Amino acid sequence: MSEVIEMHTGSISKLNDYVAWVRFNNNSYVNLEQAIEMRDKGLELFQGEKYFGLIDTREVFTNASNEALQFLANDDKLSKFCVAQAIVVDNLAVSMVANFYTKYIKNNKEVKTFNDIDKAMKWLETKKTLLN
């Protein structure tokens, strides 16, 4: 794994050549400013190449403002480069936020929630054609 970039709400690192692994600090709250930071750090990490986001919320409680969720779902820059997202959850509260993000915000066509990180990675592997 490559360098780990620390953010206000957690960290992001390259799991491999095309997967950004996003981890959250426990009890973190993502507002618009932090959502922009997450986008910018992901774009910086992959230097203009398309990539997948593996959003790992296991073993933590995290929440986000509606404004942050709307931004992450609808930002043109993020949509252009982060072409699929797998969100891994292991608790009901975070699962509800993830389900809202995946089902009710229009632009999230290639976003899915999982309870198992291996299943999330397998799903991302099926999306490799989006990287072209």
Each language-model region and where it sits:
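Amphipathic, Lys/Arg-enriched alpha-helical "gate/interface" segment within cytosolic domains
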Residues: 1-132
